[in-house]
């Protein structure tokens, strides 16, 4: 029987999405953010190094500006995200401070990771922050980037951004928090007999199709970008866990080896009992 082994994991990238941070009412999920800060601070106290990739700038901005709908105009999207990013970081800073943990902000655009000099600079920034015991909080710089907005030239969403960050920081593990339990063989919202994939060692065409590619049973939902992110992690010889973010404390259970979510790890590195 395959067993998850995370005892040697030191550097962890955690990605949390807007759906985990913003309630269906559009209000901010303060309880969830507090739980996340507690978990990350607990991991830091145990000697782990944690980087947080956080979406939510648009959601925070809509809440602050009392806008019911996301604007369709690109410039307004950028303005709303700019307002929301400040509010989000302010809240993160306040809540993490309750657990004596300092945070910093790193905003990325595609050109930063494309050009060697800027990539080296941001890599050094990550290393310096981590060496100081600070949690870098990463997001795309929506105020100047059109990649994540409703625009044709997409860098990718924060799922892929988290995989990029895991790669450039040489993280031991990427934990992706979602509003689903993991990767299923088909859509659990449509098929009652859908089965959760506990482990994925190879990203096959079947998996890509079931996640949102051609002939998908999933349709929309963002699963394809998560599978693509896992593929990027594989290319960097890393591993990833896709799990439900409803209870951030489950991160601690995952690191204890409990079989929550879907574990993406290439087969040649899998350890057996």
From Swiss-Prot:
GO terms for cellular component: cytosol. Gene3D superfamilies: Acetylglutamate kinase-like. ATP binds at residues 15, 178-179, 220-226. It comes from the Bacteria. It catalyses: L-glutamate + ATP = L-glutamyl 5-phosphate + ADP. Pathway: Amino-acid biosynthesis; L-proline biosynthesis; L-glutamate 5-semialdehyde from L-glutamate: step 1/2. One of its GO terms (biological process) is L-proline biosynthetic process. Substrate binds at residues 55, 142, 158. Belongs to the glutamate 5-kinase family. This is Glutamate 5-kinase. It comes from Streptococcus pyogenes serotype M2 (strain MGAS10270). The gene is proB.
């Amino acid at each position: 029987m395959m067993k998850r082994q995370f005892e040697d994991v030191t550097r962890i990238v955690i990605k949390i999405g807007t759906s985990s941070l913003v309630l269906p009412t559009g209000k901010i999920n303060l309880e969830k953010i507090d739980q996340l800060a507690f978990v990350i601070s607990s991991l830091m106290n145990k000697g782990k190094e944690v980087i947080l990739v956080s979406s939510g700038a648009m959601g925070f901005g809509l809440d602050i500006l009392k806008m019911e709908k996301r604007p369709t105009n690109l410039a307004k999207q950028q303005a709303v995200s700019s307002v929301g990013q400040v509010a989000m970081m302010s809240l993160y800073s306040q809540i993490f401070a309750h657990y004596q943990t300092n945070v910093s902000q790193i905003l990325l655009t595609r050109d930063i990771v494309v050009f060697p000099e800027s990539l080296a600079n941001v890599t050094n920034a990550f290393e310096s922050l981590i060496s100081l015991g600070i949690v870098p909080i990463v997001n795309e710089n929506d105020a100047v980037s059109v990649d994540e907005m409703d625009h044709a030239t997409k860098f990718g969403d924060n799922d892929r951004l988290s995989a990029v960050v895991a790669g450039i920081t040489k993280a031991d593990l990427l934990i992706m928090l979602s509003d689903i339990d993991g990767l299923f063989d088909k859509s659990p919202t449509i098929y009652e007999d859908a089965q959760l994939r506990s482990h994925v060692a190879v990203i096959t065409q079947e998996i890509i199709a079931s996640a949102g590619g051609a002939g998908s049973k999933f349709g929309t939902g963002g699963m394809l970008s998560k599978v693509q992110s896992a593929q990027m992690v594989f290319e960097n010889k890393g591993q990833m866990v896709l799990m439900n973010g409803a209870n951030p404390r489950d991160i601690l259970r995952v690191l204890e080896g409990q079989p929550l979510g879907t574990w993406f790890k290439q087969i040649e590195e899998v350890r057996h009992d």
